[in-house]
């Protein structure tokens, strides 16, 4: 790529509206797949949706999937390439992206702070094979702030405030855990560290849609500005059968009475499930790290 020209983009519609960036790659692959250069999820993109190549002050757009159009030029069929003058708006899936170039000489005169990144990736992580998953931002360059007062001087990268990121991630993780608990997803646990929210656990095929809705809630709450590492998988292990509880004692040492026998917290049942805790109207059982709620 010509060092005097950089390719910039701005999302002008969709979930990531107003997101801006600068890519240092001469050719960038855009899609929802993990191996794309710029990855957007929840926007109806194919894993490899389209490819852009900067050619001076024009942009070559190659359609790799259906559902792509250039404003003013109409739809582009899969496999077709179109060269358009910059700036240009590309419509893909549920989003629209404005692409433009800016000379390096003029970029230093802009006083408004602008995010400059070599690759912006919303990296899809986790193996939940249904719906659309959450995203994680991965910046391969430090953010650079332009300042009109620094004329002729080298710009230094502005390092992120890790403490602020950690506090934001911790607050978001706490809210996400509450939402997960409200959805009855007892096998999902949330943690936060170094500005990243991590999700681990399992869901059944029946409860997968509930987890999908929680992810959508998180995405819209954070507007894609917070990293979410998704480690949730589908596990359809057979749930324990109903418990024929004869009596329940919920005092300082709670226990169940089943077939005349007392089962305290930590006791093993016949099918290998362990009594995790006793709650009002239900017993939480655990086996191999999985929790199951059984009413009584």
Curated annotation (Swiss-Prot):
Its main location: membrane. It holds the Pfam family Yop-YscD_ppl_3rd. It is a multi-pass membrane protein. It is found in: Cell membrane. The chain crosses the membrane at residues 82-102, 117-137. This is Uncharacterized protein y4yQ. Coiled coil: none annotated. Keywords: Cell membrane, Membrane, Plasmid, Transmembrane, Transmembrane helix. GO terms for cellular component: plasma membrane. InterPro entries: YscD_ppl_3rd.
